[in-house]
Regions:
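Alpha-helical segments in soluble extracytoplasmic regions
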Residues: 28-104, 111, 116-118, 123-167
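Positively charged n-region of N-terminal signal peptides that target proteins for export
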Residues: 1-4
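C-terminal motif of bacterial Sec signal peptides marking the signal peptidase cleavage site
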Residues: 15-18
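Bacterial signal peptide processing site
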Residues: 20-22
């Protein structure tokens, strides 16, 4: 008799446990804690290399050119490949991830345009690249805002590892 009761209650328990499982929460946790680690590292390396030769750290065109060609662009290209290969299970997270890819692609193209501008000494190309960087920053902020909103909606709390921000 106990077996009959147990086996008749078991399917109900399994259905109830499935109700408590949030696939978006699971996908988001996996995304941040596992799938994006390599991408985050590659992005940090590329952006740090760019930050070291731009803005207040700018010294001359040759130094910037060398950093872009030898480190920033190749590393950022690997970052974009990694972004494109991240497995994502839910459409909600996929839509947000696509914003990240769009911003990263735009930033990569801006870096390439800066190299062309330095090679040709064309100030108009620099202006175009700076506009592209600004638009990329906007997309990357949108990504961050949307990922934060999704996390909040699905009860995911972030633990900040590094509070430094890029100047890009």
């Amino acid at each position: 008799m106990k077996k009959v009761i147990f086996f008749s209650i078991l399917p109900i328990m399994l259905v109830l446990s499935a109700c408590f499982n949030d696939p978006i929460q699971d996908d988001l946790m996996d995304y941040v804690n596992k799938e994006m680690l390599t991408a985050f590292e590659l992005e940090a390396t590329a952006v740090s290399a760019y930050d070291q030769v731009s803005g207040l750290n700018y010294s001359d065109d040759i130094t910037m050119y060398d950093a872009l060609v030898s480190t920033v662009i190749p590393t950022y290209n690997e970052f974009i490949k990694e972004l494109n290969s991240v497995p994502i299970e839910t459409s909600e997270l996929r839509e947000i991830h696509e914003i990240y890819i769009k911003g990263a692609d735009l930033q990569y193209n801006a870096f390439v345009k800066i190299v062309r501008a330095l090679e040709t000494q064309d100030p108009l190309l620099i202006e175009e690249a700076n506009g592209m960087l600004e638009e990329a920053r906007s997309l990357l902020r949108e990504y961050q805002n949307e990922i934060d909103k999704l996390a909040e909606e699905h009860n995911v709390d972030w633990e900040e590892k590094d509070s430094s921000t890029s100047s890009i």
